[in-house]
Amino acid sequence: MHVLQLCYKPPYPPVDGGTLAMNSVTQGLMASGHKVKVLSVCSDKHPVRSDALETQYKDATGFEAVYIDLSIHPLDAAVSLLCGESYNVKRFVSKEFDERLTAILQIESFDVVHIESIFLAPYVATVRKHSDAKVVLRAHNVEHRIWRQIATATRNPLKRWYLKKLALALRAYELEHINDFDGIACITANDAETFRGEGCRKPLADIPFGVDIEPIDNVDAEPQTLFHIGSMDWRPNEEGIRWFLKEVWPLIHKEMPAVRLFLAGRKMPDDLMQMQSEGVVVVGEVPDAAYFIASKQINIVPLMAGSGIRVKIIEAMSLGKTVVTTSVGAAGIDYTDGKELLIADTPQQFVEQVRRCIDDPELCSSIGAAARRLILDKYSNEALTQRLVGFYNKLGAVAL
């Protein structure tokens, strides 16, 4: 099968949740004997990292990227607001990207065009014009729901009003265009149910993010350490950590002064990089995420907004880490609270769950071991790739 994968940002190297999810599709399909061509958007925020783009990957995928200016332009944002357009989507519309996509479709034949995110939906018409391929949306999240959650949690009235407008415009766009695809591959069953409830008439599948991560040997986790790793240019990550630092960390530090908190991730805000808070170590981007995760004890993920599945939680669980997260953070994972994950939705609950792990290292280790078993059993990339290919076939995608 020949698949054209359209990505909303460069999927390689896989440095955050979105890139890990996209790259797992690429690698899974190629490992199963299918041919994949990758065409990606790149931007100032997410440039092509030529120094880290391995020749083997580039040759195997025929990787290409087209620059789009995704920066926020106040005038364009205001016009979109007045016209009721989704500015989130409009920023991805590019003549240059459309022209390159057209050229590729005219040169090569594809069985499936796999589109990563609703933000690239404007290019479905181009695919239909130049190809008979089945068009599949990989819905990483229900995007408008995330923006609605962020708006609800925003205290500034004017900012909250604007974010609600963005969420409404994005929802209107999703509802208008969700049936443009031949099928939608969601990350979670909950997201699939949401799309169905909002009028999706096309086939839906829930196919989680897959991982194939080997345990890191010869790395001892530092005792009494908490850590968070995640791209801080994704708004729910930043807002969750700021909430944790303000509402939770003072309580933990008061009750357990020996515990240290390590914060890692790309695009760490300057004020966090420079913060001086006792017991908190801000390291920013790390060269080896798996090694960093393995070297710490307890993963905290204080997400208050989001849908889909949190890739970094899956990664930490696959490495045998105990994860303390919110109900929102754990959404989409087939877990049992207290067995493979620990749930905390309030500051006091976070304190209690962290204390359980610190006071009982054996319990902490057993939860981490159960987490790894769960991921190996249900989130193997090989098995999930077969489900994705099965979904392609169900839609009528037949190898040329």
Predicted regions and their residues:
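Conserved acidic donor-binding segment of nucleotide-sugar-dependent glycosyltransferases
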Residues: 341-348, 356-362
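Donor nucleotide-sugar binding/catalytic pocket of nucleotide-sugar-dependent glycosyltransferases
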Residues: 134, 164-167, 171-216
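Acidic donor-binding loop of glycosyltransferase active sites
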Residues: 182, 291-308, 319-322
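A short, well-ordered alpha-helix in the C-terminal region of glycosyltransferases
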Residues: 363-378, 384-390
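Conserved catalytic-core segment of nucleotide-activated headgroup transferases in glycan assembly
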Residues: 206-295
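N-terminal subdomain of nucleotide-sugar transferases
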Residues: 1-64, 106-108
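Acceptor-binding helix/loop patch of EC 2.4 sugar-transfer enzymes
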Residues: 8, 75-90, 135-172, 231
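Short hydrophobic beta-strand element within catalytic cores of glycosyltransferases
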Residues: 312-316, 322-326
